[in-house]
Amino acid sequence: MYHHVNTAGSFITVGLRNFEKQMAFLKAYGYRTLNTADFSEILNNPNANAAKTVMITFDDGWADNWHYAYPILKKYDIKAVFFVVTSWIHNDGIRYFDTAFPSHKECKAIVSSGRAKEVVMSWDELREMEASGLIDVQSHTHTHKKLDGGSVYEDLSQSKGLIEERLGKKCEALCWPWGIYNDKHIDLALKSGYRLLFTTELGTNTSKSSPLKIKRIAIGDIGVMTFRKKLFIHSDDGLSKLYLRIFK
């Protein structure tokens, strides 16, 4: 689970050097990277070979994902899933940056001030990445606000509809903002047409995992040896549960 890849060195940000080393490791050691369709196939087939499979996910849709992460993903032929907040996405085409990206805290402040297009990807950028066959754009809701009251269904449906309309694809996966959800939210997501629901709960997924409570692992700005250790621990469900029971 990633958010930012840039040079800011801030909260939930991975530096370019470490991110490239992480992706290079996956490529060199023969890991298979998944999009949501690949992942769904594994969940639906108890006999599927899930050895050395990983899903790279990015939350929010920050512009540094396009500017820094995507070229590295292309270089190593790595698939990734981008969960985007559709009300933040704009129509200003493809941009070329010549300045450093702000920190996560600054990005959130810029979005709150109504200037999301300065720090978030555009529909054209998302469309180009989708066309590569490497990037799978899915929903992180429409507003990234606390989901309560009678607006939840509208929020989830609007996000799904925009992604399908703008990118000409099916949107059947949803990632909950801040990992906050309840049983009613799950029911509304299913009613909206989602089939895969991603959480921030730490852990490993297997063919027996629920598609409505998909776990993830936060990576962070770590070197390749620590990255390798995380992959080893969480490649086995039993070992992952034991580790998280001790260190969570």
Where are these regions (language model features)?
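Metal-dependent polysaccharide deacetylase catalytic core of the NodB/CE4 family, i.e.
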Residues: 2-6, 51-54, 74-182, 213-214
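Short, glycine/acidic-enriched loop or turn micro-motifs at the edges of active sites
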Residues: 62-63, 143
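C-terminal active-site subregion of NodB/CE4 polysaccharide deacetylases
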Residues: 1-57, 63-68, 132, 148-248
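Short, well-ordered alpha-helices that flank and scaffold nucleotide-derived cofactor binding pockets
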Residues: 71
